[in-house]
């Protein structure tokens, strides 16, 4: 009997000890969370990488205010706010370190191309996002994409062509990506999708380049560059990259 009472007392002491440890951990965790919530605040916001926008415009687009809590800051919400307000920005990195400035690194898209439609010039980034709406006469030096119809164009949304242009849309996006990756986009003066059998690109002020839809565009662009490298600087004409066997034909003007 005495042994049983002793065992019960020891069991109660063990239970209280465990409870004490749990409560202590909860108190410590609560204190840490309270400290993070109360003391780690947004002081300075530093923005890098912007060209078209000012630092103040990027900061305003974040929706973050001075003295906002860093610990509770949702980086994904901040990034989405910036993308929604400033469409030329395509990549964002947010470095949130406690007791340091909030660092925001942005990357803007390359020079856009224009689709002229219904009296407007819709500027499209190389990544396929509509980044700006202008009057048709204000397209400036933007290369023009012709022979297609935008479907419900809205700034900040991905380029979408009408259903009958599905093949052209996919090929256009793949070509733009290949041009940007190859560093050749600045030589493009226009892309024409009117012909359903061949895509035509005005290039370098000297060439009309014909390519099939659905092609391996990185490979086609390497072939194009090889042709150009073997021509005289005053030669102009049509470069045909439409052959399945990889042949390249140059028809001089």
Task: Mark where each language-model region is.
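Charged, solvent-exposed interaction patches on well-folded alpha/beta domains
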Residues: 2-34, 40, 57, 61, ...
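N-terminal functional module detector in eukaryotic proteins
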Residues: 42-44
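Extended, alpha-helix-rich binding/interface surfaces that flank or overlap catalytic cores
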Residues: 47
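Short extracytoplasmic
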Residues: 53-84
